[in-house]
């Protein structure tokens, strides 16, 4: 028996067979081996198996994909083997009891020159739970469960455990999906999350939607208490680290004013010969979080900390993230240091990593360092001021080196949510990245590169932060879209892929666009065509940073990837442990962990964005009828999104625009009947017509 025989049997059986029938045809020969082969073929997307224990051959009559539902009751499904192709339309009658996010087997049907998909079977029920609100029915007689996920708008919900789970109006609850029949969902209520009238509870419910843990397990908290030993009590460990001590250095932290999980600290020294030493000291989380402990297991499940508008959902319990591991000022801390030397031009000429003990002498924040850079206002000791001056000097040199080599850089604003003490949104404002944030970023990037290069040269298993080059066609599309703004770099496709030429194009955008918001939107449009950075075992480099080798070393309090990096640095460099079995285990673990943390990172980013969106809707909910100036951020088939000065964004639906509008996919513009058009960057005046808190949706209309 081999894979080819299995595939031949499935193919001869009309490309579908039950696992039992397959085993029978193979005379039940070596069932564990059959299981392994099927698993491998499934992972390679050659075969797929379903909840009904059937096996399908993919690429012929049957395809596999994830179903995405529209609130109106129909859906779309993509083909995993052709992810770039347009998704297939699935009418309500062809859903076969499946719903949003389900992994399904489907077949394509051509009906009167129209192509649609029919769901054949369910492979995997991705969504197990629904979050929603208990609301009173229109006639006031009943309490209904309304899911927050708009993909389930068209479903009726029946609660199976109403008697043992009394419900009240305005409750936000979590429900487990039990079964589905046509457009009827049967659920069991699992827990009450909070009150829909409280902003803080609404935010917490979004974290629950994304299945991000909001509480730690008891075993994890118990382990956190066990390892909570002040540095001063670990005399032997202190003595061991004293040979590489940073206690006499002017080490400082620079973070957000509200930050509590302080991972990183810096010290810069300018030498007499004009060269520089940069010390990047990172909290030694691996000293406290050992592999396979409850702390470690839950940290891997979480993957990273998630930063919401009014709270942090940390990767580690706060006793570690905000206290024991955090590089709080005037307290001895264990750290891993990356010491780098730079020449007079800002080029790194040496690097080393070691365990150390340190004290952060000053706790600085970005605002005050930005103020110092702008106006030379300083409220701390003179020694720290001198160090910051040298840090700024080195930062400027490194920045120029990175730009020359092709690091893609541009400034973008982010929406910042301002809340009162009750977590009610009182303001949304645009936050610009300052010079101090860029300084820390450049120093952290340098340390990440240095660490990655050290281990890469040792040819040992390691976790890398890879960023693949963009797809050539995607990048051509981006360059093409710039022509409607009068920007045409006249590059060959090969030249377009060169990061240096991308930087030159970004510079031209800056020079030719008079409006900074238009420039920002054009810069952001590039990101849509970029590959997503991810964690992997094999190094392929980082395109965006124009780096041959990159990892994440600088944030082990809030990223599990960095915790892995610290452990392997200690194993390889400090303990010089190259045991072959241990290396094989490292390789296997990196592969497993990378899959998990790539997913948790995406989930956290999506959750953070959804919270910001929910907060902007809440902020605009009492501004219905108000008129504002805005900028078109993107034109799509169904309308235009308009961004206000404070980065609040709303949709002008195509039904509220002029009739007979045509969408130009190439230039991303909506063409009106008089040949004028709507495109990104245009200034418009809008009126707010709705802000639906439950749907998290803002609607505008244009005002003449």
Walk through the language-model features, giving the residues of each.
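Electropositive polyanion-binding surfaces
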Residues: 24, 169, 174, 180, ...
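Charge-lined substrate channels and their catalytic hotspots, especially those that engage the 3′ end
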Residues: 1-279, 286-332, 370, 669-679, ...
């Amino acid at each position: 028996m081999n894979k080819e025989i299995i595939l031949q049997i499935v193919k001869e059986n009309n490309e579908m067979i039950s696992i039992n029938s397959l085993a029978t045809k193979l005379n039940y020969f070596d069932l564990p081996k059959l299981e392994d082969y099927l698993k491998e073929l499934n992972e390679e997307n050659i075969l797929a198996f379903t909840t009904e224990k059937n096996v399908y051959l993919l690429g012929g009559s049957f395809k596999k994909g994830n179903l995405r539902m529209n609130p109106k009751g129909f859906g779309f499904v993509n083909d995993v083997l052709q992810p770039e192709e347009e998704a297939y339309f699935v009418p309500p009658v062809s859903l076969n009891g499946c719903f949003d996010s389900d992994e399904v087997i489907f077949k394509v049907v051509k009906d009167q020159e129209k192509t649609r998909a029919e769901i054949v079977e369910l492979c995997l029920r991705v969504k197990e739970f629904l979050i929603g609100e208990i609301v009173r029915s229109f006639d006031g007689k009943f309490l209904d469960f309304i899911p927050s996920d708009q993909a389930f708008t068209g479903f009726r919900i029946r609660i199976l455990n109403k008697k043992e789970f009394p419900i009240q109006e305005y409750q936000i609850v979590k429900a487990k999906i039990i079964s589905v029949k046509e457009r009827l969902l049967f659920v069991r209520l699992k827990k009450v999350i909070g009150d829909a009238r409280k902003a803080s509870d609404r935010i917490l419910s979004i974290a629950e939607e994304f299945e991000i843990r909001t509480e730690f397990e008891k075993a994890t908290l118990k382990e956190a208490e066990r390892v909570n030993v002040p540095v001063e009590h670990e005399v032997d460990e202190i003595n061991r680290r004293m040979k590489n001590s940073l206690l006499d250095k002017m080490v400082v932290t620079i973070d957000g004013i509200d930050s509590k999980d302080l991972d990183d600290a810096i010290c810069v020294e300018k030498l007499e010969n004009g060269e520089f030493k940069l010390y990047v000291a990172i909290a030694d989380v691996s000293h406290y979080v050992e592999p396979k402990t409850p702390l470690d297991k839950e940290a891997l499940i979480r993957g990273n900390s998630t930063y919401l508008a009014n709270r942090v959902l940390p990767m580690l319990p706060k006793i570690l993230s905000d206290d024991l591991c955090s590089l709080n000022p005037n307290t001895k801390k264990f750290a891993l240091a990356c010491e780098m030397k730079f020449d007079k031009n800002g080029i790194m000429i040496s690097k080393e990593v070691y365990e150390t003990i340190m004290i952060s002498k000053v706790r600085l924040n970005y605002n005050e360092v930005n103020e110092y850079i702008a106006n030379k206002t300083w409220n701390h000791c003179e020694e720290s001021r001198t160090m910051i001056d040298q840090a700024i000097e080195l930062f400027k040199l490194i920045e120029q080196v990175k730009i020359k080599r092709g690091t893609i850089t541009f400034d973008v604003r982010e929406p910042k949510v301002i809340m009162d003490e009750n977590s009610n949104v009182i303001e949304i404002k645009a936050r610009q990245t300052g010079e101090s944030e860029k300084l820390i970023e450049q120093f952290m990037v340098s340390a990440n590169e240095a660490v990655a290069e050290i281990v890469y040269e040792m040819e040992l298993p390691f976790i890398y932060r890879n960023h693949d080059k963009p797809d050539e066609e995607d990048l051509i599309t981006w360059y093409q879209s710039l022509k409607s703004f009068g920007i045409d770099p006249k590059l060959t496709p090969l030249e377009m892929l060169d990061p240096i030429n991308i930087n030159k194009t970004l510079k031209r955008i800056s020079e030719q666009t008079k409006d900074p918001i238009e420039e920002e939107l054009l810069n952001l449009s590039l990101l849509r065509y970029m590959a997503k950075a991810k964690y992997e075992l094999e190094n392929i480099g980082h395109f965006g940073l124009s780096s041959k080798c990159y990892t994440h070393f600088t944030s082990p309090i809030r990223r599990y990837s960095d915790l892995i990096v610290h452990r392997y640095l200690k194993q390889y460099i400090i303990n010089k442990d190259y045991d072959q079995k241990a290396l094989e285990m490292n390789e296997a673990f990196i592969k497993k962990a990378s899959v998990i943390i790539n997913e948790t990172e995406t989930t956290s980013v999506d959750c953070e964005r959804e919270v910001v969106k929910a907060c902007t809707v809440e902020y605009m909910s009492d501004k219905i009828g108000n008129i504002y100036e805005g900028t078109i951020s993107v034109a799509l088939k169904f309308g235009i999104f308009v961004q206000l000065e404070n980065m609040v964004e709303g949709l002008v639906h195509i039904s509220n625009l002029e009739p007979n509008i045509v969408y130009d996919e190439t230039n991303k513009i909506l063409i009106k009947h008089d040949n004028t058009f709507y495109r990104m960057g245009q200034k418009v005046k809008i009126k707010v017509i709705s802000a639906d808190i439950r749907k998290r949706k803002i609607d505008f209309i244009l005002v003449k």
